[in-house]
From Swiss-Prot:
GO molecular function, one term: tRNA (guanine(46)-N7)-methyltransferase activity
InterPro entries: SAM-dependent_MTases_sf (IPR029063), tRNA_(Gua-N-7)_MeTrfase_Trmb (IPR003358), tRNA_methyltr_TrmB_bact (IPR055361)
Summary of the function given for this chain in its UniProt record: Catalyzes the formation of N(7)-methylguanine at position 46 (m7G46) in tRNA.
Protein name: tRNA (guanine-N(7)-)-methyltransferase
Keyword tRNA processing included in the entry's annotation: yes
EC number: 2.1.1.33
Pathway: tRNA modification; N(7)-methylguanine-tRNA biosynthesis
Family: Belongs to the class I-like SAM-binding methyltransferase superfamily. TrmB family.
Organism field: Erythrobacter litoralis (strain HTCC2594)
């Protein structure tokens, strides 16, 4: 497993920002208290498809799933695949739990907390797909080490994906865009940018739904959105 070093700017070993916003509604709190413990990954030990879902199935992992729209869409689209989502913001977790309950999805596991702590316990080469969509940009240079797209996490992504597996990244922040591309250029030995034309990165790929955050970025703030697919060599 990855060793996290205190103060090392190439790794992440703590969460930043809020963990809860407005108070949860009564039923949301009920889901957090009752459904979440049933579908959370184990607190210790390896995180495998067999342990989570009782069988060896393709395994997906989403880091920071927000309100869960993408995670739920993908899980519904691929019912024979297993999905793990990690989100530190409790309101987002509650929103995702509501969708899981409503759609009766049995192939999702949810972690309310640090994604890298769980990802670190996934066996190397076990993931089919890994998603990082609209992470917190931390736009100030002094906060750059807080960005999820840094050498330490990207090295972990490469370790956990199987050969031919896919890492999907999306952002609407130009500072994060430049930073992410700079980081990925240092990992071309592990990842190949999947692109077929010059405008691919401006067009949402098939099977990649628009989330509430992305819709807000476009319609309220007028942001462009960029989409990237990287294949594990």
């Amino acid at each position: 497993m990855t060793a996290f070093k205190q103060g090392d700017p190439t790794t992440l070993n703590r969460l930043y920002g809020r963990s809860i916003g407005k108070p949860l509604r009564t039923h949301q709190q009920h889901l957090v208290d009752n459904l979440l413990p049933q579908i959370s990954p184990p607190a210790e030990g390896p995180v495998t498809a067999e342990r989570l879902f009782g069988e060896d199935c393709p395994l997906h992992f989403e880091i920071g799933f927000g309100g869960g729209e993408h995670l739920v869409y993908r899980a519904d689209l691929l019912p024979n695949h297993g999905f793990i989502g990690a989100e530190p913001f409790l309101n987002g977790v509650a929103s995702c739990l509501s969708q899981v309950e409503e759609q009766r999805l049995a192939n999702i596991r949810i972690h309310n907390g640090d994604a890298l702590e769980v990802l670190d316990r996934v066996p190397d080469g076990a993931l089919t797909m890994l998603y990082l969509l609209h992470p917190d940009p931390w736009p100030k240079n002094k906060h750059a080490k807080r960005r999820m797209m840094n050498d330490g996490p990207v090295k972990m992504f490469a370790d956990k994906l199987k050969p031919g597996g896919e890492f999907r990244f999306g952002t609407d922040h130009p500072v994060y865009l430049r930073h992410a591309l700079m980081v990925m250029r240092r990992h071309t030995d592990a990842f190949e940018w999947v692109v077929e034309g010059p405008s691919d990165w401006q067009n949402r790929p098939s099977g990649w739904p628009e989330t509430r955050y992305e819709h807000k970025a476009r319609t309220k703030f007028g942001h462009e959105v960029w989409y990237f697919r990287f294949r594990r060599r």
